[in-house]
Amino acid sequence: MEPGPSVSPGPSRSFKEELLCAVCYDPFRDAVTLRCGHNFCRRCVSGCWEVQTTPSCPVCKERAVPGELRTNHTLNNLVETLLREEAEGARWTGRRSPRPCRAHRAPLTLFCLEDKELLCCACQADARHQEHRVQPIKDTAQDFRAKCKNMEHVLREKAKAFWALRRTYEAIAKHNEVQTTWLEGRIRDEFDKLRDFLRVEEQATLDAMKEESRKKHLQAEEKMKQLAEQTEALAREIERLQMEMKEDDMTFLMKHKSRKRRLFCTVEPAPLQPGLLMDACKYLESLQYRVWKKMLGSVESVPFSLDPNTAAGWLKVADDLTSVINHGYRVQVENPERFSSAPCLLGSQVFSKGSHSWEVDVGGLPTWRVGVVRVQAHAQAQAQADVGGEGHSHSCYHDTRSGFWYLCRTQGVDGDHCMTSDTATAPLVQAMPRRLRVELECEEGELSFYDSERHCHLYTFHAHFGEVRPYFYLGASRGDGPPEPLRICHLRVSIKEELDI
């Protein structure tokens, strides 16, 4: 059998790769060129720009202008030619004469599914393949091409997933740049406040010291002036006494009584008064401690902050990280710790030992939850929510059985109720609390809730909590007014002074 006409070699692999879009990894469809020189499918690059704040090239990140997209006719023609040649090559390959078997020189027309080898009719009768499943090459190739097509689809989907993940990392990087600038400003502002406070205290201390110095100087000047006048009076008296002693005896004796009274009335020198020196102890004694103690009155402290990295898209955390509002859903940068399907967030601290307490002002929020969540349970709930998709309710996993312990305000047909995460418990109180105190005893395994305004106990959970974080849910506000916040109450700081023994 003569071999068929030779087939011209197809395009090289590197050339084919140059005709693939960097976004979809398929041959270009309606190729367009950006100002930077990179080429993409028009639909692909437009899709990328829909999720970008500022349009840029998906490859080099150079800023792009959507109106400057230029259709690349040359590239489109090359892709069309390549696809046509590959189709013709595939048809010719199907018409070529089959290769002969090396052992029997017979046409290879069968395929062994067990050994994955090409066979001729003589090979099929061989003992090595007698019990094996074989089928015609054409049928096998068709089946394998279908499998490869599926694998190609899987790989393309995986490549798209990698590209989407890359865009997510780009969004995270940009978010971190903005966050870094914002954090730098906030940190500088906070330290500026401390420096301003210290400058004011320094100036007040210096002013007080200078005022005392001025008063003591005036006091010393007044005393020196009095002493100068008294010294001058004594000098005149001494001069007068010397003159009288030069008089004759009769005159001298006649003035004795008046002279004695006059000398008796002269002023005696007064002793030095205490407190004339500058009081160094008054200004330097524990100066730093006294200023720090005074600073506590102007410094606000909270048991923990609200973690914005866990806040769902509905929530906006205040700049001081102590309050949060529900302003409706807005797209946030992806983060595996972020709640995805319910308006929830966590506190910044992880508690596993000791006693901890905090107060939360829920005000008149129509729906809320306040409590703790086991760290591992939060990760598991996030994974289940991601598997469930967009329509899945993340909130359905938030109960005691799955590691969430909280009090909540819920809306029912017969009014609002204060409930717990344990669905077996009945509503707790008729009067809805506005300020909750939470007390966590890790070693005792107790989580207690109190109404801070009414000073009454509401409920206590008993469980082995493990590592937990504060947990909050914030429903949408009622009416058209501004959204009402949920706040972490500030601590009352006190100082206990003890001897260092």
Swiss-Prot record:
Binding positions for Zn(2+) per the UniProt entry: 101, 104, 123, 129
Domain of life of the native organism: Eukaryota
CC terms in the record's Gene Ontology section: cytoplasm; nucleus
Gene Ontology biological-process annotations: myeloid cell apoptotic process; negative regulation of cell population proliferation; positive regulation of myeloid cell apoptotic process; protein ubiquitination
Expressing tissues: Widely expressed. Highly expressed in brain, heart, kidney, spleen, skeletal muscle, lung and thymus. Lower expression found in stomach, large intestine and bone marrow.
Domain B30.2/SPRY: 284-495
UniProt key word Zinc-finger: yes
Induction field: Induced by macrophage colony-stimulating factor in murine peritoneal and bone marrow macrophages.
Chain segments annotated as transmembrane: none
Principal location class: cytoplasm
Biological or metabolic pathway of the protein: Protein modification; protein ubiquitination
Catalytically driven reaction(s): S-ubiquitinyl-[E2 ubiquitin-conjugating enzyme]-L-cysteine + [acceptor protein]-L-lysine = [E2 ubiquitin-conjugating enzyme]-L-cysteine + N(6)-ubiquitinyl-[acceptor protein]-L-lysine
Chain intervals annotated as zinc finger (B box-type): 96-137
Modified positions (N-acetylmethionine) in chain numbering: 1
Phosphoserine modified-residue sites: 8
Entry's Gene Ontology molecular function annotations: transferase activity; zinc ion binding
Record localization: Cytoplasm; Nucleus
Signal peptide positions (record): none
Keywords of this entry: Acetylation, Apoptosis, Coiled coil, Cytoplasm, Metal-binding, Nucleus, Phosphoprotein, Transferase, Ubl conjugation pathway, Zinc, Zinc-finger
EC code(s) of this entry: 2.3.2.27
Entry-linked SUPFAM superfamilies: B-box zinc-binding domain, Concanavalin A-like lectins/glucanases, RING/U-box
CDD domains per record: RING-HC_TRIM35_C-IV
Comment field on protein domains: The RING finger domain and the coiled-coil region are required for the apoptosis-inducing activity.
Family stated for the protein in its record: Belongs to the TRIM/RBCC family.
Chain's role: E3 ubiquitin-protein ligase that participates in multiple biological processes including cell death, glucose metabolism, and in particular, the innate immune response. Mediates 'Lys-63'-linked polyubiquitination of TRAF3 thereby promoting type I interferon production via RIG-I signaling pathway. Can also catalyze 'Lys-48'-linked polyubiquitination and proteasomal degradation of viral proteins such as influenza virus PB2. Acts as a negative feedback regulator of TLR7- and TLR9-triggered signaling.
Name listed for the protein in its UniProt record: E3 ubiquitin-protein ligase TRIM35
Gene: Trim35
